[in-house]
Amino acid sequence: MLVEGSELQSGAQQPRTEAPQHGELQYLRQVEHIMRCGFKKEDRTGTGTLSVFGMQARYSLRDEFPLLTTKRVFWKGVLEELLWFIKGSTNAKELSSKGVRIWDANGSRDFLDSLGFSARQEGDLGPVYGFQWRHFGADYKDMDSDYSGQGVDQLQKVIDTIKTNPDDRRIIMCAWNPKDLPLMALPPCHALCQFYVVNGELSCQLYQRSGDMGLGVPFNIASYALLTYMIAHITGLQPGDFVHTLGDAHIYLNHIEPLKIQLQREPRPFPKLRILRKVETIDDFKVEDFQIEGYNPHPTIKMEMAV
């Protein structure tokens, strides 16, 4: 198709997929679609799932933060886990000590032994997300080793490229390292993210190979939205969009009834996220630097984690 030169404007708006009035409706419609059309599949945990392959949603980060409201999302867990990733830690006990126990089951003695990691300390998850983000390609020894200067610091390279060459199409961070997969307590579900700069805004697209719609996906949406806010802050940009692309999007069979309750609820306005001080580097962020305002979710819905 030919386009008249007068229509080509450097300041043209970024094309956006059609999104419903409230961003959360995208998530709820995905859940409804999987319940209606999903294929019943067996899975690693033995729980069983309803599964659909290939879904996408776009959440605006402009003056709102996509922390789902049709149930309470564990904001403290989102924040502490992301700071733990950024630190490069692979020690589940560091999170546990802060009241965030989402990695406890995968770092337990029984689980590690079941994978053949009997020589590994309890809590040592292997070269998972934080290690790949900050030390990709380094040889993993254990969770207590000092990896300073080893491997590729993908996160810092992302930040540096956004500052120096924002139009680059290779602003990518990848946690999927085939060499290290056999050493991980859990291979990465959220595998690769790409950043995009236009009109002074930073957007992020996540490719998530495996999405647990009941428990994991609401958490992952908030986590990568938060990462986008953080990187935008230190690169002098405004948050744009978070685009969430799912591979195997699934509902565990024991989550169907809880999710039916969630689908009956009307979304409430998304909260706002404030960063309370000027932070210069990604490693300097602290828990107290963030404030969620106006979060008024529906009550918690209990769902069991499949391990």
UniProtKB/Swiss-Prot annotation:
It is an enzyme of class 2 (transferase). The modification Phosphoserine is found at residue 108. It catalyses: dUMP + (6R)-5,10-methylene-5,6,7,8-tetrahydrofolate = 7,8-dihydrofolate + dTMP. Residues 7-16 have a biased composition (Polar residues). GO terms for biological process: cartilage development; circadian rhythm; developmental growth; dTMP biosynthetic process; dTTP biosynthetic process; intestinal epithelial cell maturation; liver regeneration; methylation. It comes from the Eukaryota. Residues 1-22 are annotated as: Disordered. Its EC number is 2.1.1.45. There is a cross-link at residues 286, 302 (Glycyl lysine isopeptide (Lys-Gly) (interchain with G-Cter in SUMO2)). Catalyzes the reductive methylation of 2'-deoxyuridine 5'-monophosphate (dUMP) to thymidine 5'-monophosphate (dTMP), using the cosubstrate, 5,10- methylenetetrahydrofolate (CH2H4folate) as a 1-carbon donor and reductant and contributes to the de novo mitochondrial thymidylate biosynthesis pathway. This is Thymidylate synthase. It comes from Rattus norvegicus (Rat). The lineage of its organism: Eukaryota, Metazoa, Chordata, Craniata, Vertebrata.
